[in-house]
Amino acid sequence: MKRVYTLLLFVALIFSLTACSKNLVKGSIVSQSNDTMAQLDIMPQKLFEFAEIGDIVVVIAGDFKEEMPLVDELIAEEGKLQLFYDSNEHSLSICSYNQNFFETYNVSPDAKVEINKK
């Protein structure tokens, strides 16, 4: 019986540690059909359970680590690297917005992507 309580305590501890983690979502680049967009296989809906448009997030993709705002079309700023939410496509991309087009950071297709709210 003591082992059961110990096991339950251990499971509760692990759960509480992961529940308090600021890690939002993990994924990888799944398609980069052209140089304008790199879509991530992470669900924006899952991201928005934790972060909102305008929040600063830390994006880690392979060796790349950058702090950037989570933006949509309305608040994208020219020349700044941003985590961009496309409401039409319901996709996320890491990009720099310049004169109505995206310049996407070159991320390896097999790179794991981790997004943390700052």
Feature roles, as predicted:
Residues 17-19:
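C-terminal motif of bacterial Sec signal peptides marking the signal peptidase cleavage site
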Residues 1-4:
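Positively charged n-region of N-terminal signal peptides that target proteins for export
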Residues 21-96, 102-117:
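Long, compositionally biased stretches
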Residues 6-14:
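Hydrophobic helical h-region of N-terminal Sec-dependent signal peptides
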